[in-house]
Regions:
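Bacterial N-terminal signal peptides
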Residues: 7-15
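Positively charged n-region of N-terminal signal peptides that target proteins for export
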Residues: 1-6
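Sec/Tat signal peptide C-region and signal peptidase I cleavage site
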Residues: 17-21
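Eukaryotic helix-grip
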Residues: 22-214
Length: 214
């Protein structure tokens, strides 16, 4: 009887193991100390995770991420970026346009950004969530309907930090999910390579943010 019970549970076991395998993070790209992972989640578009260590303080990183107008200098294929509304020193709404490869239409993103910090661990969280209905869409751009981006930044020393980055996105438009997933790790990798250079600029290295403890 015991073997029969075990036999009955085999399909359940393999189903559970298969689900876990599908949800496991898979390393897709590694370059210059940057690791980019992806996994299949509940949505049709892959989730993305990035990991890197950067020679920068929390303040340097926060200053760069709050400097929305400069996103065009490092964020992959961003062609325009500006603040829509500054709510406080650590919170704002912003707008960006993103160039995509032909024949796909270019995208635009409307988003809310908020920075928080754990008072005990000092880990800084930068959370950006799309707000697609905040302003009217334009007919020549596809409005990204959903984007959820999180930076978890942990201080390692007075001059070095570890970044763990998470992204879930639905880019909108008619492109099939399999095609989007095929190239989903390229944008974060290219962005982080430029980010490592951008964050070393004097205006970030010399910055002071009162609500961040390094």
């Amino acid at each position: 009887m015991n073997w029969f019970k075990q036999f009955l549970f085999l399909p359940l076991f393999f189903s559970f193991a298969s689900a876990r395998a599908q949800n496991a993070w898979v390393l897709k790209e590694e370059e210059n100390g940057i690791k980019i992972y992806s996994r299949h989640g509940a949505a049709k578009f892959d989730e993305i995770r990035g990991e890197l260590v950067v020679k920068a303080r929390l303040t340097d990183i926060a200053s760069l991420l709050l400097d929305v107008n400069e996103y065009t200098q490092w964020s992959y294929n961003v062609t325009r970026a500006y603040i829509l509304k500054q709510l406080s020193a650590d919170e704002l709404y912003f707008y960006t346009t993103v160039k995509t490869a032909w024949p796909a239409s270019d995208r635009d993103v409307v988003a809310h950004l908020k920075i928080t910090q754990d008072s005990i661990t000092k880990m800084m969280t930068v959370h950006t969530i799309s707000e697609p209905n905040l302003i009217p869409a334009t007919k020549d751009l596809v409005r990204v309907p959903f984007s959820d981006e999180t930076w978890k930044v942990t201080p390692l020393s007075a001059t070095e930090s570890r970044i763990t980055y998470y992204l879930q996105i639905d880019p909108g438009g008619a492109a099939p999910a399999w095609l989007i997933n095929l190239f989903s790790t390229k944008a974060p990798m290219e962005s982080f390579k430029k980010f490592l250079i951008q964050v070393q600029k004097p205006k970030y290295k010399q910055s002071f943010i009162g609500f961040i403890r390094n």
